[in-house]
Amino acid sequence: MKDFENYSDRKTIQTRIRFLCFIGAVILLLSGCAVCMRLTPDRTYSAEERRMLSKRPSLTKKSVMSGKFQRKYETYLSEQFPGRTHFVTLRTRLTRLLGEREANGVYFGKDDYLLERYQTQDFDWKQVRKNVKRTASFLKEYPNADVLFVPVKSSALSQKLPMFAQIGGEAQFFDQVRQQAPRQQQIAVEDVLKAHDSEYIYYRTDHHWTTLGAYYAYEAWAKHMGFTPVPKEQFQVMPVTDTFMGTTYAKVRTGGKADTISLYEQSGDSAFSFDYNMGEFQSDSFYDLSKLEGEDPYSVFFGGNQALVDIRRAEEGTNGKTLLLIKDSFGNCFAPFAARHYARTIVVDLRYVNLPISKLLRVYPADDILILYNSVQFMKDTDIHKLK
């Protein structure tokens, strides 16, 4: 009996020791991570996700009382956590082993598609309303301007979503746009893209549309403008990589299937010349093929997001006019199509231009203006106030 009690006591002690060792290891791990975060400079950009990362939020009484500081700090910690990429990969694989159809805001869809999940509560609706109101005011002030919003992959390719998956927020946004913006200045492409949803119009592993998807939107825009779109058959389609793994894949680090990026070229493209960022550098092509070997192959279009690209073309075959294209990254593969109708095309990204469009128009007068954004990126954008 005494031997049993001694054995039981030893087991209890061993269990406590193991528990204390586990607690100690967790504390050491968390302490080590905290020290690493202190000693390691915050990253400003994630090459894997092709986006800016959160900065350490400012601590104020107002931000704490409203809960804004806590939310921002939680996001900051999750994005700056040491070894985050490896943790994301491990967590996602475990999630999939458990049979889950979604991880880290990404649905594992049909046919190797990875589709981002959006819910109504994910958006700052005050910011959304401000952006819609500012854009509607701009359109009323500039009757020569139009707006084209690209739907997210999750809604355009809703048939690829897993069963019972739900997407929220975008429909409410489109309702606001339809109610506030002049109807004749809206170019709706939701139905256009839906009509081609069996084709390769969005990348499987990235949030962007493919060049083919951009072409179908270009057709709709050209008809709206009274132009004859360049027939698809007149382009030489050049696949330049078939190993592209995009931003959506970077969020889960598993699943999906490598994408192909294709460029649409046409005889006469040598007539174009390009000036970047008001004389920073020049080019003779819509494409920077060196980017295919880098971390972001999608940057093959114009070398990535640029503040301002001034595209000129010989007058022959154009309408002799100037187009101002105000866009996010979705406009990068759209611009080469639109530029074929103009003698000059000014491509602007508001995120990198520190002046209002009205001042820019004094330097670059435009006959036509097109605002082209992905719906969700527009909803979250904090630079739309420059549309004035």
Language-model features: where?
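Extracellular glycan-modifying ectodomains
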Residues: 1-388
